[in-house]
Amino acid sequence: MEEDQEEPPSSSTSSESPEVVLKAPKAPTRRRKNSKKDRRQDMEVDDGEKESTAQYCKGFYDALRVMQTTNKYEFTGGAVSSPVLPVLQTAAFSPITPASASDMHTIVMSLLGNTPITSGPSIAPLSSPTLLPLVTSGDLDDLSMKILASSAIPGPPIISSSNSPDSSTTAVTTSQITAFQPLLNNFVSSTTASTSRPDKLNLTPPQQSAEIYAFNGVNSDDSDGGLDSRSASRCGMALDDQEKKKLERKRARNRQAATKCRQKKMDRIKELEEQVLHEKHRGQRLDAELLELNRALEHFRRTVEHHSGNGCPNNSIRV
């Protein structure tokens, strides 16, 4: 009896074991699906970060290239050892890669004209036409970030003298950033308007001329006003042409109407002249008839007088 009683639990365990075996593989499959989804999401996030980083760094590469073309600087040979060189030595539209911290420092210092890009003794350092006193290396970290902030946000540059105890260094830094702020603003606006593709970079002479105007202190509002005045003058010229055409058409219609009116007047004058001639001829005929009647009347009087003189009384006729 004990063996018979012990057998059911064994059968129950054997019946439960296949269920456990069937349920076990489902858990890892779900984990794999979840892991694939997570990987896809991570890959999408990484791609978005790469695109945003490339878009953010593209402005600095464009700024550096425009500064190089403005200063007419040419690289020579293997004396150049700069982290920016692989980008600058390629074609005008090179692929954009995320920049490191050292690349950012090199770009900022080359824009300010304080640090040479080349390390060879035969190549002169890159300098701006309006070269100002140097900035200390201790201010480089804060300086790079504050230059970017001042270029992105319009207004006076934001600079503190926490790292530089000397007030003259702070004044020099402020003047340098103020001098280069119009160029940086133009670079930021041009890069944000362009796409992330390298072949869509806006490195054209008109942009460079606009930057030179901004650097020389020419107000962009004046140029906008000039463009507005030109467009207004063109619109005025177009309106003048339209008004002239309308006036010519009106004059042509007036000339046609005047011609018709003169023709009607001439026709009426001819009709009246014909009527005058007709009335003259009629008057002449009436005058001739009147003469004939006067002659007949005179002849009748003479006849009556002759009869009365011969003794023929005629009381009905009275002279």
UniProtKB/Swiss-Prot annotation:
Stretches assigned to the bZIP domain: 244-307
Start and end residues of each stretch annotated as Basic motif: 244-285
Source species, domain of life: Eukaryota
Gene Ontology annotations for the cellular component aspect, listed alphabetically: nucleus; transcription regulator complex
Positions of the UniProt region annotated as Disordered: 1-52, 216-264
Keyword Transcription: yes
Major place of residence: nucleus
Coiled-coil regions listed: none
Transcription listed as a keyword: yes
Entry's localization field: Nucleus
Record's compositionally biased regions (Low complexity): 8-19
Gene deletion effect: Sixty percent of animals display an egg laying defective phenotype. Animals display numerous defects in the reproductive system and have a reduced brood size.
Sequence ranges of Basic residues compositional bias: 28-38
Assembly and interaction partners: Heterodimer; with fos-1.
Protein's name according to its UniProt entry: Transcription factor jun-1
Gene for this chain: jun-1
